[in-house]
């Protein structure tokens, strides 16, 4: 199963890595901004 995800470079495609990292970063920022806006993270 794992071999099917390995390409010619032996690494995960860069666009997949960028998409995952970007999604996690935006999600984390969204949670932080939402928390600070609603007052849940205002104590931080």
Swiss-Prot record:
Record-level GO BP terms: photosynthesis
GO annotation, cellular component aspect: chloroplast thylakoid membrane; photosystem II reaction center
Principal location class: plastid
Superkingdom, natural source: Eukaryota
Coiled coil: none
Membrane disposition: Single-pass membrane protein
TM stretches of this protein: 12-32
Keywords noted in UniProt: Chloroplast, Membrane, Photosynthesis, Photosystem II, Plastid, Reaction center, Thylakoid, Transmembrane, Transmembrane helix
Subunit architecture: PSII is composed of 1 copy each of membrane proteins PsbA, PsbB, PsbC, PsbD, PsbE, PsbF, PsbH, PsbI, PsbJ, PsbK, PsbL, PsbM, PsbT, PsbY, PsbZ, Psb30/Ycf12, at least 3 peripheral proteins of the oxygen-evolving complex and a large number of cofactors. It forms dimeric complexes.
Known function: One of the components of the core complex of photosystem II (PSII). PSII is a light-driven water:plastoquinone oxidoreductase that uses light energy to abstract electrons from H(2)O, generating O(2) and a proton gradient subsequently used for ATP formation. It consists of a core antenna complex that captures photons, and an electron transfer chain that converts photonic excitation into a charge separation.
Name under which the protein is recorded: Photosystem II reaction center protein J
Organism: Bigelowiella natans (Pedinomonas minutissima)
Lineage: Eukaryota, Sar, Rhizaria, Cercozoa, Chlorarachniophyceae
């Amino acid at each position: 199963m794992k071999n099917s995800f390995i390409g010619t470079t032996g690494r995960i495609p860069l666009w997949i890595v960028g998409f995952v990292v970007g999604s996690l970063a935006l999600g984390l920022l969204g949670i932080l901004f939402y928390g600070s806006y609603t007052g849940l993270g205002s104590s931080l």
